[in-house]
Amino acid sequence: IEGIDLSNSMLEQARNKNIYNKLEHRDIVEYLSTEDLDFNYFISTDVFIYVGDLFDVFRLIKSRNKSRGKIAFSTEHTDKDGFVLEKSGRYSHSKKYIESLCEKFDYKLSYFKKTDLKKIRGKFIIGGLYLLDF
């Protein structure tokens, strides 16, 4: 299990769990561009809200991973087209946008659920939970 994050505090929390073989303080696109990728699963929770355009993430996983696999991830959800930078400073992504990336890079959308992800200042944040096969 490998973990990457830009937040030192999140990496410290991960380190304290003692389950990771490797932890790196890096940008996700840089990591996917430079590391040998041979994973069955990519799991990304509360990450894509800081990325916005997921084109390179989807492209790099599909083109650089040595085997077939699955991607499980969450997004903050929007019904607008594409992805939107919200007032919170986080990005939300539409299901239609994720489906367009799936079509472009030949991923299969196996599961989607719109749900309450978390509560911030007393208000639920609506998110999308996805499972893709590639």
Where are these regions (language model features)?
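Class I SAM-dependent methyltransferase SAM/SAH-binding core
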Residues: I1-Y31
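Local beta-strand N-terminus motif with an aromatic residue
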Residues: Y20, D38-N40
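A conserved beta-strand element that flanks and buttresses the S-adenosyl-L-methionine
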Residues: I43
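Hydrophobic adenine-recognition pocket in adenosine-nucleotide-binding enzymes
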Residues: V47
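A short glycine-rich, Lys/Arg-flanked "PGG" loop and its adjoining helix->strand segment in the class I
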Residues: F55-K70
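Short, glycine-/aromatic-enriched active-site segment of Class I SAM-dependent methyltransferases
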Residues: F73-Y91
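Short alpha-helix
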Residues: R90-D106, F112
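Core SAM-dependent methyltransferase catalytic element
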Residues: D116-F134
